[in-house]
From Swiss-Prot:
The active site is at D174 (proton acceptor). This is Galactokinase. GO terms for molecular function: ATP binding; galactokinase activity; magnesium ion binding. Mg(2+) binds at S130, E162. Belongs to the GHMP kinase family. GalK subfamily. PROSITE patterns: GALACTOKINASE (PS00106), GHMP_KINASES_ATP (PS00627). It is found in: Cytoplasm. Its EC number is 2.7.1.6.
């Protein structure tokens, strides 16, 4: 039973009537462009075929009822006419409540909803299960009540909910790719303008995601420290964001900066340049150049931004040794664990799977999880 069938069946069973709509929003993997989004820079993610699915129907009153199928059918119920506050014990509820609260501030021309939520985006892996949930919930209200909101606005609404209601200082990329993803393409996103350019993926290339299963937490962690260091760097150059600083300007005065801040700034500036070049390499089908750029990105995250861990570096080394220059591999996501992403010819997938299975656990004591993904369509009805 797929997620659509599962949520529709559960909806009918619990609520006693059929759902009118089923909405999906995908998770994502970022191919290159890490920690550039909140610096107004460029990112190159693609949506993946793992998603949050919500079967839903409008109500004729002002109540929102939510069932979380993946949490033993836990229930949340709240009124649109009372102030929406955080839930004491159900963290998943706060993503739903936050999205609805911020939607009310944008356009409150909507009423109650019944919904059943389920998803298969791996949680805590850096594949944006939370953004997928936020975009799915926003799309539910937009579709059921014909709200005049486009994908970018639904994405921004989700980001606001996560920043202000949930309390995690994320950038815009995760929500934007979930809302705007295009099948068989990556998106080069300008995080300042929110402009997105579809970049076709070469034929016969697999997007492989390997979860290190080294546990990471983002909320309240090193992520916010990195963000502050980047803001310190932008202030030093008297610019609104690091996006506005050139590598030449940085190199001329790097020695005047705090050494740690200088490393963080160098990563962001070089990563922005790599990301723009990667989009054109991908479009030309130049997997060799893409691989070089991904390798440089990983080294920069490891040495300048200092967000990798030994388990992740081990995974990258195993994959790189297997594929050589036929594709690329790097850490993806916020850092401190999580996943690596590899772009490799489909016929090399079995060899990579085997090499990782034979070596990773032996070296780290942790068993990996291996996903082969397809670049997928963004949020909408399914």
């Amino acid at each position: 039973m797929n997620l659509k069938e599962k949520t529709r069946a559960l909806f009918a069973e619990i609520f006693g009537y059929p759902a009118t709509h089923t909405i999906q929003a995908p998770g994502r993997v970022n191919l290159i462009g890490e920690h550039t989004d909140y610096n107004d820079g460029f990112v190159l993610p693609c949506a993946i075929d793992y998603q949050t699915v919500i079967s839903c129907a409008p109500r004729d009153d002002r109540t929102v009822r939510v069932i979380a199928a993946d949490y033993d059918n836990q229930v949340d119920e709240f009124s649109l006419d009372a102030p929406i506050v955080t839930h004491d014990s159900q963290q998943w509820s706060n993503y739903v409540r936050g999205v609805v609260k911020h939607l009310q501030q944008r356009n409150n021309a909507f009423g109650g909803v019944d919904m059943v939520i389920s998803g298969n985006v791996p949680q805590g892996a850096g594949l944006s299960s939370s953004a997928s949930l936020e975009v799915a919930v926003g799309t539910v209200f937009q579709q059921l009540y014909h709200l005049p909101l486009d994908g970018a606005q639904i994405a921004l609404n989700g980001q606001e909910a996560e920043n202000q209601f949930v309390g995690c200082n994320c950038g815009i990329m995760d929500q934007l790719i979930s809302a705007l993803g295009k099948k068989d393409h990556a998106l080069l996103i300008d995080c300042r303008t929110l402009g997105a350019k579809a970049v076709s993926m070469p034929k016969g290339v697999a997007v492989v995601i390997i979860n290190s299963n080294f546990k990471r937490t983002l909320v309240g962690s090193e992520y916010n420290t990195r963000r502050e260091q980047c803001e310190t760097g932008a202030r030093f150059f008297q610019q609104p964001a690091l996006r506005d600083v050139s590598l030449e300007a940085f190199n001329a005065v790097a020695s005047e900066l705090d050494p740690v801040v200088a490393k963080r700034v160098r990563h962001v500036l070089s990563e922005n340049a790599r990301t723009v070049e990667a989009a054109s390499a991908l479009e030309k089908g130049d997997l060799q150049r893409m691989g070089q750029l991904m390798a440089e990105s990983h080294a920069s995250m490891r040495d300048d931004f200092e967000i990798t861990v030994p388990q992740i570096d081990t995974l990258v080394d195993i994959v790189k040794a297997t594929i050589g220059d036929q594709g690329g591999v790097r850490m993806t996501g916020g850092g401190f664990g999580g996943c690596v992403v590899a772009l490799i010819p489909e016929d090399l997938v079995p060899a990579v799977r085997q090499a990782v299975a034979q070596q990773y656990e032996a070296k780290t004591g942790i068993k990996e999880t291996f996903y082969v993904c397809k670049p997928s369509q963004g949020a909408g009805q399914c």
